[in-house]
Regions:
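N-terminal Rossmann-like FAD-binding beta1-loop-alpha1 element of flavoenzymes
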Residues: 4-31
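Short His-Asn-centered micro-motif
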Residues: 9-11, 32-34, 61-64, 152, ...
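Short, solvent-exposed loop/turn segments at secondary-structure junctions
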Residues: 13-15, 36-39, 101, 221-223, ...
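Glycine-rich FAD pyrophosphate-binding loop
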Residues: 23-48
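Short aromatic-enriched loop/helix-cap "lid" or pocket-rim segments at secondary-structure transitions
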Residues: 42-45, 98-100, 259-260
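Dinucleotide-binding Rossmann-like beta1-alpha1 core, especially the glycine-rich loop
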Residues: 49-122
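Active-site/ligand-binding neighborhood in enzyme catalytic cores
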Residues: 90-94, 101-244, 255
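Mid-domain catalytic core of redox enzymes
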Residues: 222-286
Length: 286
């Protein structure tokens, strides 16, 4: 490993960008990834039907920071793309994050107006809140609405992803998708929302295209790396490594699950190709 100044474990977005930054500072960089492809969870490919597929689920690049979008624009052309999502509840489609349209979808006009009025009165300067906040609200109408969403969506969806019962869900997980207090649609509210014109793999290839970067795939890095805590050394292939090690993988694996395994949510992908122009009301429906 004497030939390298930096070893980066993981060739996802963080690993690729860090490698590029070091390479531009004239550092020799080696990237290891256990997968047989670059791009991490952003990896995409064209399938046998000519469809560009995001192998690990849909990914939209989004940020509020102009300088970040300017940076990624050095490595790819981008097309504006505002992601919209929805949910099927009791056989009816409604947008997510849930908004005032959701109230209209599941309550009669009189009750819907009462709930929306209560929300406006209780949250005059707020655009959204978490379901946890609404579940604990003193107003009965607001609390009832939150209970409906929790019972029919949040608890089921989250429990399925994390593989636990609704009662075992960590409250912090329920804060990820807020409830909106307006009719706004769109999953993100960031100014910059884009998809690469070509593909994410093309974007990653351009980031990694540098004479100071070497990529090795199908490598179990943790089989070759040892953290010598007694001597405060990094040991690679039984030799001390005096360079920089950047690790972007699962933190519990790095420490050999010394403090137990961390919980991770998971998905099972089933690929089906339909011979129709449009299959559902939004790009993502849960």
């Amino acid at each position: 490993m004497e030939n390298y100044d930096v070893i980066v474990v993981g060739c996802g977005l963080s690993g690729a960008v860090i490698a590029r930054q070091y390479a531009e500072k004239k550092k020799k960089v080696l990237i290891w990834d256990r997968r047989k492809h670059i791009g991490g969870n952003m990896y995409d490919y064209v399938n046998e039907h000519g469809i560009l597929v995001h192998m690990y689920g849909p990914h939209t690049f989004h940020t509020k920071k102009k300088q970040l979008f300017e940076y990624v624009s050095k490595f790819a052309e981008w097309e504006k793309y505002n992601l919209t999502c929805g949910a099927q509840i009791n056989g009816k489609y409604t947008p997510t994050p849930f908004n005032f349209q959701t109230i209209d979808d599941f309550y009669d006009e009189k009750k819907a107006n009462m709930i929306k009025t209560a929300i406006k009165e209780e949250y005059p300067d707020r655009k959204f809140a978490t379901v946890l906040e609404l579940l604990n609200h003193k107003n009965n109408l607001i609390r009832e609405y939150a209970q409906f969403l929790f019972k029919n969506d949040y608890s089921l969806y989250t429990a399925k992803q994390w593989g636990v019962s609704p009662e075992e869900i960590d409250p912090s997980v329920l804060k990820r998708v807020p409830i909106r207090f307006n009719y706004d649609v769109g999953y993100f509210d960031d100014e910059y929302q884009y998809m690469p014109t070509n593909s994410y793999v093309n974007f990653f290839n351009n980031i990694l295209n540098h004479s100071n970067i070497t990529v090795e795939l199908g490598v179990e890095a943790l089989d070759r790396i040892h953290l010598d805590e007694d001597n405060k050394e990094i040991v690679i292939d039984n030799n001390r490594f005096d360079g920089i090690l950047v690790y972007t993988g699962a933190i519990d694996e790095l420490f050999k699950n010394k403090y137990g395994k961390l919980p991770y949510r998971s998905l099972e992908f089933k690929w089906v190709t339909e011979e129709k122009k449009s299959f559902q009301q939004a790009p993502v429906v849960a």
